[in-house]
C-alpha cells in the first residue's frame, strides 16, 4: 500500500504552543481509567481511519509538528527493540493484511518525557505499512482521558495503547475497552483493573536502588524528606515502596515528612519552602521526579540554606538530569526510559494476531505484567556514559547554589 505514513496520525486536542512551552522544562507530567466493532475486522479499522482523517480543526496538531522537538535519532536508538521483536513489514492477521488502527491515549504532552514515548510509538508504527495510529492527548485530566478512550472505542480502533494519568481514575474507561473486546495495553503506570497487558519498568526496584545510594552517601544516618509524584499514580506508589524498603534496612535514617510534588517543579518549591521553615536540619531530599529536585534546590537557595549541603536523589532519566548528576546538583538519578511505546505497539499487534506475550506473567493486579529490565542508577561515576542515552533535548536549570 502506497500512502503518506502520517496522513492519519493525528494528535487531537493539542496546541503546539502548549508543547513549545512544555519543552522549556516546566511541564506537569513525568515519569507515571460502548461498544466497538470486532477487534480485527476491516470494517472497524476503515471507519477508524476515516474518522481520524476527518478529525481536523482548531487546537489540533499533526504528529510530525508535535515531534519537531523530539530527540530520537531512529528506530535503532530505541533501548528495548529486543523485547517482543517484530520484523518490519505488513502485519498479517488470520492470513490477511487488513488496515489496522492503534489508538494511543497519552496522559498529556506537556512534558518531553511524554513526547519521547510518542516518538517510540510512531517509530514502531512506521515499520508496518498497514498500521496507523490515532493519538489522543488527555491533557493530564482524568475526565478528558476517559472521554478519549471512549472516543477511540467509538472510532472502532483495533487496539488501544494507554498511559493513564491516574491508576484508579481510568478504571471505568479500561473496563469498557475490555468489555468491548478491544486489546488494551497499558504503559508506564498501571490501571487497577483488568487489561490485556501492563508494560513497565519496576519503579520499586529503581527507587530502591536510588535510596540505597542515598543511604550510602549519608553513611546510614540522617534526616530526609520525600517529594512524591502525583499521589494515586502507580509510579508514585511504587517509588515510595522502594524508598520504604531501603529505609527498613537503614534504621539510622529518619523520614521527617512527605508531600505530593505532582511530578512538577512548582509544588516542590512550595513543599520545600514549608519544610525548610519547619525543620532546621534536613540532610537529603528524595524526589520522585527531576523537576521536583530542581524545585527543591530553588527553595533551598531562596531560604539561604545552600551551606547546609542538602543532598538530592531523584528519578526520571533525562539527559538534563544526568547532566545535573555529573555537575554535582544531584547525587543519583533513577534511570527510567520513556522509550517504551514501541513495545506497546508490538504487544498490541501480537494480541491482534492471537499470539501470547512471551515473558508476561500474572501479578498483583488483574491482567498480565511484562516487566522491563532494570537500568542502573546514574551516579557521578557513570553519568558521562549515560548523558547521551538520556531522553529530552533541554538543558538543566542553573544550580541556584553554585
Named regions from a protein language model:
Residues 106, 110, 121, 208-258, ...:
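An alpha-beta-alpha
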Residues 137, 191-213, 226-230, 258, ...:
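Short beta-strand elements at the ligand-binding edges of bilobed clamshell
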Residues 167-205, 223, 318-326, 330, ...:
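Flexible loop/hinge segments that line or gate small-molecule binding clefts
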